[in-house]
Structure formats: C-alpha cells, structure tokens
Design a protein with these regions (language model features):
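Glycine-rich, aromatic-bearing surface loops/beta-hairpins
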Residues: 103-192
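Metallocofactor- and cofactor-centric catalytic cores in central/energy metabolism, strongly enriched
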Residues: 22-23, 62
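Ordered, amphipathic secondary-structure segments that act as subunit-interaction surfaces
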Residues: 83-114
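N-terminal basic/disordered segments at the start of proteins
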Residues: 26-41, 151, 161
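Conserved mixed alpha/beta catalytic, RNA-binding, or beta-rich assembly cores of soluble enzyme
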Residues: 40-81, 168, 173-176, 181-191
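Bacterial N-terminal signal peptides
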Residues: 9-16
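Bacterial N-terminal signal peptides that target proteins for export
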Residues: 1-8
Length: 192
C-alpha cells in the first residue's frame, strides 16, 4: 500500500507540473486573444523584438511571448482572421530588408519565416522611426497591444494597424465622393 501511495503522489505531482507548464506556455496566447477581442479600428498591435522599448503610456498593454516574431505573427494573424471586425494593415521596417546576415546572423532565416507567417497579407515598408512616431500618435487616443518576443534581431518588429474588417478604403473613398457630390449639388441649386 505504501508503494501505491508513492506512485499516486508522484503521478499527481507530475500531472500538476505538466499542467502548470501547459498553462505557462499558453498564457501569452490567452492574453493575446483577450486583448485582441477588445481592439478595433485605429488600434495597433506590435509584435516586437526583444529590445523594443517598454511603453509607459496608459492604453498600452504588454504581453511577453516566449516565441520568436514569426511564430507570434502567425498566431496573431490567425486570431484576427477569425473576426470580421478588423483586418490588419501590416507595416514592416524598411531597415529589415537591408540588414545583412553577416552582421545579424539568422536574419535571412527570420525574413523567410516572417514571409510564411504573413499568410499572404501585403505589407507596407516604413522607416522604424516613422512607425514609432505613428504608434506614439495613435496611442494618444487609441489602445496599443505590444507582444514582446524573444527575437534578438534588429528591425524585426512588425506593426499591425487595425482597419475595419467590413469596410475598405475603396468603399470609404466612394462614400466620400458621393457625399461631396451631394454637398455640391445642394450648393448649386437654382434660386427659387
């Protein structure tokens, strides 16, 4: 009976240790789901490399992810693709294209993995400083989610600007043109 009790205690300890590790590994993913559900138009998600500066402004939520940028990007895009509320406009740093593998070993592999993790989404390139300025401006009025990864390669952060999922730029442009035409027609009505 004593041996059975030891086996039972050891089994329970191993099971709880295994479950604790599973919870620990999934914590960042749960946080991403929770925060992403609260974000909408004009909010931002940054999938950041390890040295990305900590943000202290209200409205910035930070999540530590024990993965590399491509894995976090893949996960975030899968979460966003499950909603019709928002779609990401994806910005990458212009500098990333020019960083050489000789100076940052692993950058070529990271770029390949990032391309795969993009799920076919188009990207826009901007200088990192311009992206940080856009992020700072957005954070004055809107929330930002920063997912800090373990990637230790320069200029590898990805910036997702959230747009309405059910309304695109073409629809907005057509609406504005129609409103402008209606306004112009009201201004040129004949005098009775």
């Amino acid at each position: 009976m004593n041996g059975f009790r030891r086996i039972l205690v050891c089994g329970a300890a191993l099971l709880s240790f295994g479950c604790a590790n599973m919870r620990k590994e999934n914590t960042w993913q749960g946080a991403v789901i929770q925060h992403a559900r609260q974000l909408g138009y004009r909010n931002w998600i940054v999938i950041a490399e390890a040295s990305f500066p900590a943000q202290s402004r209200p409205g910035v939520r930070q999540v530590m992810a024990p993965v590399e940028v491509p894995e976090a990007l893949d996960y975030v895009l899968r979460v966003l693709e499950q909603t019709e509320d928002v779609r990401p406009q994806i910005h990458v740093t212009r500098e990333l294209r020019s960083v050489e593998n000789d100076f940052a070993p692993g950058i070529d592999d990271l770029r390949k993995r990032m391309k795969s993790a993009l799920h076919g989404h188009d990207t826009t390139e901007l200088d990192q400083q311009s992206l940080l300025t856009l992020l700072e401006d957005a954070n004055r009025s809107y929330d930002v989610l920063v997912i800090r990864t373990q990637s230790a390669l320069p200029y590898s952060s990805i910036f997702l600007e959230l747009k309405p999922g059910y309304w695109d730029e073409l629809s907005e442009s057509r609406l504005r043109e129609r409103i402008d035409r209606e306004r112009a027609q009201k201004l040129v009505r004949p005098f009775p």
